[in-house]
């Protein structure tokens, strides 16, 4: 029974993680306001020029990785690399002199402790192994019950 519960405790969270990546977040951000995307990764609108061009910086506080978009206009996007992972930044709208509507698309595990990406990228293998553990546990439990 314990083996079956162990298998279920791995499969269910694994299914949730597999359906959650990549993440998309759209929100309004004020110039020089820092917002957390996920884990230790934060983003900041560093400059809004003439209500047209926007510069955004993304930082991983854990390892100090930093990348910047350069100047983007409304409708443009840029791919930034943080800790080896790609974060897509798209400017949706410049609302006024210092407010910007931005869409971020990123892997769920960016900024998580090391090893998280291994779990999420190999989730299919983990689910197969956990299912095998559950089946073996069910067979073993059925065998033990039938002996009594």
UniProtKB/Swiss-Prot annotation:
Q: How does it sit in the membrane?
A: Single-pass type I membrane protein
Q: What keywords were assigned to this record?
A: Host membrane, Membrane, Signal, Transmembrane, Transmembrane helix
- State which residue ranges cross the membrane: 119-139
Annotated signal peptide: 1-18
The listed locations are: Host membrane
Q: Please tell me whether the keyword Membrane is annotated for this protein.
A: yes
Q: Which residues lie on this side of the membrane: Cytoplasmic?
A: 140-148
Note whether Cytoplasm occurs among the keywords.
no
UniProt name for this protein: Putative transmembrane protein ORF23
């Amino acid at each position: 029974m314990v083996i079956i519960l162990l298998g279920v405790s791995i499969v269910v969270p694994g299914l949730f993680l597999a359906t959650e990546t990549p993440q998309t977040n759209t929100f309004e951000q004020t110039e020089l306001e820092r917002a957390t995307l996920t884990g230790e990764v934060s983003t900041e609108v560093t400059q809004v020029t003439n209500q047209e061009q926007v510069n955004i910086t993304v930082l991983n506080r854990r390892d100090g990785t930093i990348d910047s978009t350069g100047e983007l206009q409304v409708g443009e996007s840029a791919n930034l690399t943080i800790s080896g992972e790609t974060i897509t930044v798209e400017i949706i709208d410049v609302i006024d002199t210092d407010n910007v509507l931005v869409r971020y698309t990123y892997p769920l595990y960016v900024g998580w402790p090391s090893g998280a990406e291994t779990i999420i990228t190999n989730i299919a293998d983990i689910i197969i192994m956990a299912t095998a553990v559950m089946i073996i546990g069910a067979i073993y439990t059925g065998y033990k019950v039938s002996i009594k």
